[in-house]
């Protein structure tokens, strides 16, 4: 799809209300249910993505995005929502979908190419056998996630540069952000999570997470209704006892006992009061000055 040229200021923010999500959707939504409940879900997710784009300035200076598509529910949903926003004129960037085939056993090599062709999105399928590297390097009994993620991210950065993209767009959602926060809190002794927007170490690509406000349950319902051809992860997904699963179970229990607390926790990550914490690098407790120490 050719995009109209626009000035940088024009792509920084687009004022949107619910009326913008009415009317004909992208053709890929022709398979979507016509139910009122699904329409509400679709509009809620579109609204949350647009809110994240605006809140974190994701459109600032952007022209071409590499969208990581793993074959899971989150990345499929992300791509569909971005394509719909683009179709409606609310996302003035070019999208390039990318799947990194990491050489996992029984990975169905035809599924993603066939699907991406069918929805008419520019895409690239890249093969890199990081599976063998992970199996060789990670000790028996240890989890693969960290090394697998680093190898995948490095390859996606490379592909993004080769494709002339200025951003790498990933499908992490609300629960991913909260789970990462509590993993750092309990095991790293620090307050940190996944940022919605991050400049990579080389300074040439921005990492974006437009699903930052989206609930995993909503994405699961959306993906099921859209009948995306889900590909399970036979590497990381086959491992039991991952620490992230413990955080997921803890958060699910909190939400069950106190509904709405996940949204409250997510809001808390955006309302940090440095003077009421214990980090002298963020607040000068010696002089009680709001300016951090040099």
From Swiss-Prot:
Pathway: tRNA modification. [4Fe-4S] cluster binds at residues 145, 148, 236. Binds 1 [4Fe-4S] cluster per subunit. The cluster is chelated by three Cys residues, the fourth Fe has a free coordination site that may bind a sulfur atom transferred from the persulfide of IscS. The thiolation reaction likely consists of two steps: a first activation step by ATP to form an adenylated intermediate of the target base of tRNA, and a second nucleophilic substitution step of the sulfur (S) atom supplied by the hydrosulfide attached to the Fe-S cluster. Its EC number is 2.8.1.-. The lineage of its organism: Bacteria, Pseudomonadati, Pseudomonadota, Alphaproteobacteria, Hyphomicrobiales. Homodimer. It is an enzyme of class 2 (transferase). The keyword Ribonucleoprotein does not apply. Disulfide bonds: none annotated. GO terms for molecular function: 4 iron, 4 sulfur cluster binding; ATP binding; magnesium ion binding; sulfurtransferase activity; tRNA binding. GO terms for biological process: tRNA thio-modification. This is tRNA-cytidine(32) 2-sulfurtransferase. The keyword Repeat does not apply. It catalyses: cytidine(32) in tRNA + S-sulfanyl-L-cysteinyl-[cysteine desulfurase] + AH2 + ATP = 2-thiocytidine(32) in tRNA + L-cysteinyl-[cysteine desulfurase] + A + AMP + diphosphate + H(+).
